[in-house]
Amino acid sequence: MNRRVVVPTLLVCAAPWLGGCQATDAIVDYFGPHADPTLTSLAHDASADAHALQKLDPDAASLRAQHADELYSEIERLCGRDEEGHVPRSCEVNREGEAHEATDAAAVLAAASSSTKEQLDAVSPESRPLLVAQAIAMEARSTDEPGAVPELTEDDADLATELLDWEYQQVYALDFARSYVTPDVEELVDERLALHENRVLALQEAVAKIGPVPQPAAAYTSSSGELPVDADSARAFLDYVAHSDTVTWTSAASQEVPDQAAPNAEWRSWLISVAAQSHRISAA
């Protein structure tokens, strides 16, 4: 984290080699905290995207404007504030991004998501969840589905196994709910079941390459404490299951592996893609 202590005015004025307090700003600018360059670059890109997308896709423009605001706020949070609540002069940034033209909103968001993911390891760990959330939000607007699970390392084994167990639970929950839904909802449940079963197969195949594959339990309980008992509760349960899936995969994509020599960028990118898929389902 790029924090430094701002030199107190009293000490600056007392220094014999300075020509009075007029040098304070220059000293603070030099010794004070500075904006994270990666966050600044991403914020400028988001601002430029928002401007370029205004007429092409107002919703996408709004999303990128939100991202810019979040990134500038993160820059200020990392820099800290003085006793009067102001960000140090040394941390002030120009909020004007370099303008560019856009003809395809999906391409703009895809490029922005890719750039965001590439910069994840260039920012401090405490800023990564924000970048992950932004990448997920952009990919959630796409219709692209996650590809095959990339090759896992031993460091990824625990999380992959946990997610496989989670997918077992999702399949059980949806299968249970299907017994109570009305006929017009059965197709929706079947679509979601197929999606989660595909995730199960993909994770089983990936986990099998690095260790034993855990098998599903005979039954699972709901973390909400309640399972469906009729059509109304089944419909509400489906919403709960979709929301829980979004939370779980978003958390997984943001998770840091302790003592990992080098992050598995492809695995993290896949987790972001699955989280985005879950967001699309939950919003549908």
Q: PLM features: what roles do these ranges have?
A:
Residues 17-20:
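C-terminal motif of bacterial Sec signal peptides marking the signal peptidase cleavage site
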Residues 1-11:
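N-terminal export and membrane-targeting signals
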Residues 22-284:
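All-alpha RGS (Regulator of G-protein Signaling) helical domain and cognate RGS-like helical scaffolds
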